[in-house]
Amino acid sequence: GIDRITEISKSMRTFSRGDTATKIAFNIHEGIDSTLLILKHRLKANQSRPEIEIVKNYGELPEVNCYPGQLNQVFMNLIANAIDALEEGNSGRSFEEIKVHPNRITITTEVDGQKPKVLVKIKDNGIGMSKEVKEKVFQHLFTTKVVGKGTGLGLSISRQIVEGKHGGKITLISAEGKGTEFAIALPLT
């Protein structure tokens, strides 16, 4: 009990650490891990599906000069959207079917040495997106979620944080029935 509370408290401090006015050196893996801990309740098994698997392919990363709280918000938006896509894809599937073909989110980090930058890829094996949705997904107030579930701000804000505040790039690869991958490239300067 107490250990769990301590773990969550520490995670919340890591997650919100970045409301700084200037960029600071930050361990990206700590940010992702704290985000996963905060979202743990959504990843756990429930009556309709087994636990969502998280696969971490963490490479060796240097600390990144950034606004940690803002980047953590990006990780939160992308992972929460992946969970939503997986849950939507579970519609009409039995617990046993999902167990055989489990819901999975794969997070890969690496350094691209060509142009010194850190890459963070968040991929789900959910329902994927149509061409029409892909074209609009970063638009302000665009959402595919039912009223009350999504605001249409998450990906628009994520792009602004990655590209506007950090000089990075956020891209998307998705195909219907094949899942979705968001890739974040952050300069190492």
Which ranges hold each PLM region?
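Core catalytic ATP-binding domain of two-component histidine kinases
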Residues: 1-189
